[in-house]
Amino acid sequence: MSECQNIHQKVIEYLEENRPRYLAAIRELARIPAPSNHEEQRAIWCKQYLESLGATGVVIDDALNVIFPYHVSENSNDLCAILGHTDVVFPDTEPLPFREENGRYYAPGIGDDTTNAVAVMEMAAMAIALNLQPKTGILFVLNSGEEGLGNLKGTRQLMKDYGSRISRFYAIDGELDSVVTDAVGSKRWRITITTEGGHSFGNFGNRNAIYYAAKMIDTFY
């Protein structure tokens, strides 16, 4: 058996052996609310979970990213970043509803991206347990602010801090039956529409900001 085949076999065995822990982590994390820009509770949970699996040097940065540098030194370049985001699109700040039905888990944001965030942590745990020796350092990242008004806050902070040191970037998101290889970016604008306004009856005929906003949205789509 080649070295590659041997590692592959160890990975498969590890994943099967630790599947119950992986599922338990999903059940727990899925209940923790994490609207964009308010991922504090999940960040703390993820840091503690990684540390419980043997990770050292785990940090929560100013953007609420949870970062575990694996075999990364101050002089490490050519880094590989593996990310799963912690925020969900739902604004809830109370514990999220969760249920299991016919072998399936149901919870707000569980597929985007709670399950994958746990998968990233399990990858890190596997690297530690199997004492994997990568050719380059790896950043395991639970990033914040991926959804909506989060505006990629966590990723922007990561690139600000590590910049050109990162040569490979993998975002684990959505379903796992496809790979997107083209760069994906986003731009956001904050638009203010100012009109005369006034009372809908007494000032009838004045320009209405809502009308123009709706017209702009219709044009975009």
Across the structure, where does each feature detected by a protein language model lie?
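Acidic/His- and Gly-rich active-site-bordering loop/insert found
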Residues: S2-Y106, A129
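A short glycine-threonine-serine/GTX helix/turn-capping micro-motif
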Residues: E13, V179, G198-F204
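A short glycine/serine-rich beta->alpha loop
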Residues: N102-G111, G198-S200
